Curated annotation (Swiss-Prot):
UniProt entry tagged with the keyword Ribosomal protein: yes
Metal-binding is among the record's keywords: no
Pfam families assigned: KH_2, Ribosomal_S3_C
Protein name: Small ribosomal subunit protein uS3c
Main subcellular location of this protein, as a coarse class: plastid
GO cellular component, as recorded: chloroplast; cytosolic small ribosomal subunit
One MF annotation (Gene Ontology) recorded for this entry: rRNA binding
Alphabetically ordered keywords of this record: Chloroplast, Plastid, Ribonucleoprotein, Ribosomal protein, RNA-binding, rRNA-binding
Residue ranges annotated for the KH type-2 domain, each copy included: 39-109
Gene assigned in the entry: rps3
Origin species: Mesostigma viride
GO biological process: translation
Compartments, record wording: Plastid, Chloroplast
Length: 213
């Protein structure tokens, strides 16, 4: 049986960039990793409806720069324009440190090219008790309209309330997972339904590129 490797980790430094950019002393490393993880969890929970696809973190001395890739920047900024200020204040209060936070927003013009947002779309449909095949079909159609070269979606759990859990997958186009130069976007999420948790995995093939540079 073939052993599966994470599609993003497999391509780090080739076609994928790191989501965190910083160096630290060995004694501080684990604390900063935990802090990065907390920041991402907090922002994803706080901005659950803002279509956040990715959060990059960069550290410089005592400053933390956070870049949020979102399909709905208006929900992040807020009507009064103080949404970012409130997020920074909340992070400083919760982390209880003296670091300076800076948050920038990057607008995603084609959200259906992002595997994270496609997965969230399917999860939302499943939580609304929609048939899983219809949810997958709609997600594939949206991705194809956005211009992807290939997409693969896998769902696992008690699908449509079945007594026995199973997994099913659909693939449209090419998804070359063993090609390093293939620009693969991958994500996984969960849909919490009345029948239990359903796992969702999405692979999107956007084309080939030589390197991130």
């Amino acid at each position: 049986m073939g052993q599966k490797i994470h599609p993003l980790g497999f391509r780090l430094g080739v076609t994928q960039e790191h989501r965190a950019h910083w160096f630290a002393k060995p004694s501080e490393y684990k604390f900063l990793v935990e802090e990065d993880n907390y920041i991402r969890k907090y922002l994803n929970a706080k901005l659950a409806n803002a279509g956040v696809a990715r959060i990059d973190i960069q550290r410089k001395a005592d400053q933390v720069e956070i870049e949020i890739y979102t399909a709905r920047p208006g929900l992040v900024v807020g009507r009064t324009g103080k949404g970012i200020e409130n997020l920074i204040r909340d992070l400083q209060d919760k982390l209880r440190n003296k670091r300076k936070f800076r948050i920038t927003i990057t607008y995603l013009q084609e959200p259906d090219l992002e595997s994270t947002l496609i997965g969230e779309f399917i999860a939302q449909r499943l939580q609304e008790r929609k048939p899983f095949r219809r949810a997958i079909r709609q997600a594939v159609q949206r991705a194809k309209r956005a211009g992807v070269q290939g997409i693969k979606i896998q769902v696992a759990g008690r699908l449509n309330g079945a007594e026995i859990a199973r997994s099913e997958w659909v693939r449209e186009g090419r998804v070359p997972l063993q090609t390093l130069r293939a620009d693969i976007d991958y994500s996984h999420c969960q849909a919490k339904t009345i029948y239990g948790i359903i796992g969702i995995k999405v692979w999107i093939f956007k084309g080939e590129k030589i390197s991130i540079n």
